[in-house]
Amino acid sequence: MKITPIAFESLGVRSQATLIETKDLRVLVDPAISLAPRRYNLPPHQREVDRLTELAKVLVDVAKDVDVIIVSHYHYDHHDPGYVIPTDIYKNKLVFIKDPQNMINNSQKYRRAPRFLRSIKDKPSKIEIADGKTLELGHTTISFSPAVPHGADERLGYVIQVAISDKDSTVIFTSDIEGAPKDVHLKFTKEKMPKTIIIDGPLSYLLGRVLKEEELEKSIRNMEEIVKNGLETVIIDHHVLRDINYAEVLKPVYDIAKDLGVRVTTAAEYLNLEPLILEARRKELFKEDNRPARIPRGLANLLSAGEG
């Protein structure tokens, strides 16, 4: 099995786009890329825009040769109705989606999911609701969790986690569980016993606003439990990498992983690259170069559509 992170915060954008390849299947999870519309009360910097453009091209190129596309929920850094990533990537693909009607918040149920489904209409070879299902495609098994909360607050909606297994190993893609602040977030991992997990980490950059101290502490404790679950590799990236002090936030997890011989890494480091932290450094980027960014129309429309 080969795991290739395509776009993540440690690669300079908001995304969790991941390619997972087994001997007989190529699966693309959450093919979307976004930026924070505002951070430190600043719009995206030109370096962020350039990086998004670069990775969008990579993502579109990767999508040409995949068999399966999975959409874990309807936030714009996980799905795209055509703002930045053209919907032609779904042509002739087997597409698994988060249930657009059940266990979903109102903004996704009544606006985002319907718009997305209209945008890809008649393009996939098949669209299937994935929540709670398991299927075998060749020698590959794909399992989906029932919908679980998008972090500690159900108002942000629900996501599905994904487990992909071949004869040799299993990888879990947690989607946006925000570092697992609820015990229900752990159930799927304990059931599937993966060798590798891709997890987003807590919203520590919003501590005191969206995230409570006790929720952060619970997330860290539960991530420690995940590390103890027989894992070999933990890719922690996405929400927590929006915090410039992410390594300090994750120190308890790193410490336990070191004791157990588990590799904990960002998506960039997994690819043997230095993390390219842009959003968390936006203030610094504008100090270096304060010219307004040239934002393409599609990205401008995406940014005006709102966060998440």
Swiss-Prot record:
The lineage of its organism: Archaea, Thermoproteota, Thermoprotei, Sulfolobales, Sulfolobaceae. This is UPF0282 protein LS215_2281. It comes from Saccharolobus islandicus (strain L.S.2.15 / Lassen #1) (Sulfolobus islandicus). Transmembrane segments: none annotated. SUPFAM superfamilies: Metallo-hydrolase/oxidoreductase. PANTHER family: UPF0173 METAL-DEPENDENT HYDROLASE MJ1163-RELATED, UPF0282 PROTEIN MJ1629. Belongs to the UPF0282 family. InterPro entries: Metallo-B-lactamas, RibonucZ/Hydroxyglut_hydro, UPF0173_UPF0282_UlaG_hydrolase, UPF0282_hydrls.
